[in-house]
Amino acid sequence: MLIIRETRMRSEKYPSELLENAVEAISSLPGVGEKSALRLALHLLKQPVENVRHFTDSIRLLRENVRYCRTCMMISDDEQCSICSDNSRDHNTICVVENVRDVMSVEATGQYHGVYHVLGGKISPIDGIGPSDLKIIELKNRVEALTESGVEPGNIEIILALSGDVEGETTSFYIYRQILAFGIKVSSPARGLGFGDDLEYADQLTLGRSIVNRQLFRP
């Protein structure tokens, strides 16, 4: 009886079940509440069918066909992303970040010309995320491949550009311990960012300066 009552209340709230379904789907996106979802759904109703079809096809194709770079785990249309395939970049300097958004944030500064490594998160026992759930082994393999290719360890730099909260610091320390034996340079951005701030929310000027003025990592 409870389910029937809830269904009846919801159907009375919206003049169309199709509209209700669209609002439910849109509101499932992060940061989108029911009111915003309704506004977006009504906006889509006013658009030409071809525009809406292009919109939905773009999302579907993204989900079905997007790849992750085999080298750095960045989103890519091909097996290797445009950054890793760019010979003008410094491939001996690897900036380690938590997610794809962080790469985009650092790139937007125009101050960094190395390559990246996307971990896919940070160590968080509360959330059930351990080292094996992140791309840490892949990072070690990249460093090992560089040393085996003849690059002097002193010419290899890993920048630990993770968030400054407890989980981010824990992840940075863990990675540092894992790559310490290679004898390479390990650094971190100058702390112009507040404690616990994510790179995504840092302004470009502050973030750019923190990358340029990076310091040796001190556990």
What residue ranges belong to the model's regions?
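Long C-terminal interaction/binding lobes of large macromolecular proteins
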Residues: 48, 112-113, 140-147, 154-219
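Solvent-exposed alpha-helical segments within well-ordered globular domains of core cellular machineries
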Residues: 20-24, 38-42, 53, 57, ...
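Alpha-helix N-cap/helix-start motif
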Residues: 52, 128-129, 168
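Extended interfacial segments that mediate partner engagement and assembly in macromolecular machines
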Residues: 37, 86-161
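Cys/His-rich Zn2+-binding cysteine-cluster or related metal-binding knuckle/ribbon modules and their
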Residues: 11-19, 28, 38-103, 216
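Post-transcriptional modification and biogenesis factors for structured RNAs
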Residues: 8-9, 13-14, 145, 149, ...
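N-terminal amphipathic/basic-hydrophobic helices that include classical n-h-c signal peptides
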Residues: 1-8
